Swiss-Prot record:
Keywords: Endonuclease, Hydrolase, Magnesium, Nuclease, Restriction system. The keyword Magnesium applies. GO terms for biological process: DNA restriction-modification system. This is Type II restriction enzyme BsuRI. Its cofactor is Mg(2+). The keyword Acetylation does not apply.
Length: 576
């Protein structure tokens, strides 16, 4: 709450208190404003037997006290919270501490501990990225020093660094949502406690709202009904907000910087009127119409990265067709799919764009059929496109995220979307480093570091050129794969394909199919230096499916030696 809002609220409390005192003494209150008179009239109708009243300003720490305390003639004590708002606005609950809210409100010290650990990791990454933006590559890890550098280079947020802020807050939101999802699925009573505290159920909450006219005053009691656990829903909105729907009312938890780029993070809480089905349908129709309007205004402008544009537009059209199939689904961010189309569709020629638009209509059936096989009965509650730059788990590279309700549990399903011109085209998955490919992130069977260092030394003295270095490294890597167990090979393939379900549209043929990443059938075979001296290939499912790993330098030859990457391309069987 801003200083001005706080002052207005405090003055309202003081005015109501003074008027109520006079009224209890049977004195006239005509000298007070209409707002004050209507408020005390409402209070006295609720509690006609008031003996006396005290204000929070009678205490030494008013901010930690209830606005008014009523002492009834029966001996009962009533705590009152007073709110004064313009008509159409919502009351603002007290903000919660980002590093304490899960323990304080949801009664989970363990969940708070996990969140705080992730918070520190993401905050350090954020500071490092902002400093790197200004200074280039660096090896500074001390948080205090990083904050000092951020404050000196960026005293305020600018367009230059907004992406790093948004990514950081997005990851906090995702971590919070995941923890609350687990908490919800455990049917934990912490949700009930959070509802009671945030919605002040043990107090009487009086909202006075006013319009432009002096006599336009409405006073009401804020007392939402306590929901059962089955009436509670989790949702997301924007890029930094988690929502909790308690029956008919919603509570939002929004992560934000207190002010400047190096300052602390706040958790702003707010009450949210959850959109009804008709409102959600209207929002979704508006999104679809905007996308259709763009399609009709298409003008082709040739660019070098056509395949990336096709992939991005495929993501947006998949989103579009989900809105069409599920017209009342909640959109986390209605603007994003429109922005995606607007950014990329001009890079695709008219014929290809029409094929892509038409063929993508088949993908919803492919995905929903796979979800039916997996969960039987489910409800899609929300839909979201995940920007590449925001992905926190490099093995979970989903483009589309669906939040599902399955047997009264909340399930998050990430889906990796691919668009191919032909059935036998290959899909690029990840670009892991040669140094880490055998480590725990992928195959978990050792390291290539000693081999890389040996080849690098020979490159440095001129014994090997770029091509020879890649051939030697690729062969050594292939031989290590050839000695791996089936379990290690399957693990590596799983991790290269990622955790997300894969949905593919073959837009040249107008079909789509969907696969779970766990579907690795039959023996995995290793083909060393196939199809070239700088590649190795793994095949499975009677060699109908494969991953090819091609070695390359991360920079062009003019830079000399640079880190070695592996381009991972897979070919999957197209099952309709």
């Amino acid at each position: 709450m801003g200083k001005n809002s706080k002052a207005i609220g405090n003055n309202h409390v003081k005015s109501v208190y003074q008027a109520l005192l006079q009224s209890l003494k049977s004195k006239s209150v005509n000298g007070f404003s209409k707002i004050t008179i209507e408020t005390i009239s409402f209070i006295k109708n609720l509690y006609p037997e008031i003996d006396s009243v005290t204000s929070k300003f009678d205490n030494s720490r008013p901010d930690q006290s209830k606005d008014l305390t009523l002492y009834l003639k029966s001996g009962e004590t009533i705590s009152l919270n007073l709110f004064l708002i313009k008509k159409g606005r919502r009351i603002q609950p007290k903000n919660a501490g980002a590093k304490s809210f899960l323990e304080k409100y949801f009664l989970s010290a363990e969940m708070q501990k996990i969140f705080n650990k992730e918070f520190e990791r993401y905050y350090l990454d954020y500071l490092k990225e902002v400093v790197e933006h200004k200074k280039g590559t660096h090896y500074i890890t001390d948080k205090r020093e990083l904050k000092r550098l951020v404050s000196s280079h960026f005293p305020k947020f600018t367009e230059e660094i907004n992406l790093y802020r948004d990514k950081f807050l997005f990851n906090l939101r995702e971590t919070c949502f995941t923890l609350l999802q687990q908490f919800y699925n455990e049917k934990n009573i912490g949700f009930t406690h959070a509802f009671n505290v945030f919605f002040m159920v043990n107090d009487t909450n009086i909202i006075t709202s006013y319009g432009k006219d002096e006599n336009d005053v409405k006073v009401e009691k804020f007392a939402p009904a306590s929901p059962s656990l089955k009436d509670i829903e989790l949702y997301k909105t924007g890029k930094s907000t988690v929502g909790i729907k308690f029956g008919e009312v919603g509570l939002t938890l929004r992560f934000k910087f207190e002010s400047d780029p190096w300052k602390s993070i706040k958790l702003a809480t707010g009450y949210h009127e959850f959109p009804k089905e008709k409102e959600r349908v209207n929002v979704n129709l508006k999104t679809m119409r905007r996308m259709e309007k763009l399609l009709n205004k298409h003008e082709y402008a040739k660019t070098s990265n056509n395949s990336n544009a096709i992939g991005k537009c495929h993501e947006a059209w998949t989103y579009y067709y989900f809105l069409k199939a599920f017209p009342d689904v909640i959109q986390v961010d209605p603007k994003q799919c429109v922005e995606l189309i607007n950014t990329y569709f001009s890079s695709i020629n008219q014929n290809t764009l029409k094929k892509l638009y038409s063929s993508t209509s088949t993908i919803v059936d492919a995905i929903t059929e796979k979800l039916r096989q997996k969960y039987h009965d489910y409800i899609i509650e929300s839909i979201e496109l995940i920007p590449d730059a925001y992905i926190k788990d490099r093995l979970d590279t989903g483009d589309l995220q669906l939040v599902l309700k399955v047997n009264n549990n909340i399930i998050v399903e990430n889906i990796s979307l691919k668009a191919l011109a032909k059935r036998n085209s290959k899909i690029t998955t990840k670009n892991p480093g040669m140094g880490s490919i055998l480590g725990p992130t992928y195959f978990n069977m050792g390291s290539m570091e000693s081999v890389i260092n040996e080849v690098k030394n020979k490159f440095t003295i001129g014994e090997f050129n770029h091509r020879k270095s890649l051939e030697i490294l690729s062969y050594e890597f292939g031989m290590k794969l050839d000695s791996a167990t089936q379990e290690q090979l399957r693990r590596g393939i799983h991790n290269l394909l990622g955790k997300a379900m894969i949905a593919i549209t073959i837009y040249g043929e107008g079909i789509s199919f969907c696969k779970e990443p766990s579907e690795i059938d039959g023996e995995v075979k290793v083909h060393v230096n196939v199809p070239s001296a700088i590649q190795n290939t793994l095949t499975w499912n009677n060699e109908l499916e494969s991953i090819s790993l091609r070695a390359k330098f991360s920079k062009s030859q003019k830079h000399g030696w640079s880190s070695i990457k592996l381009t991972s391309e897979c070919q999957l069987e197209s099952r309709k």
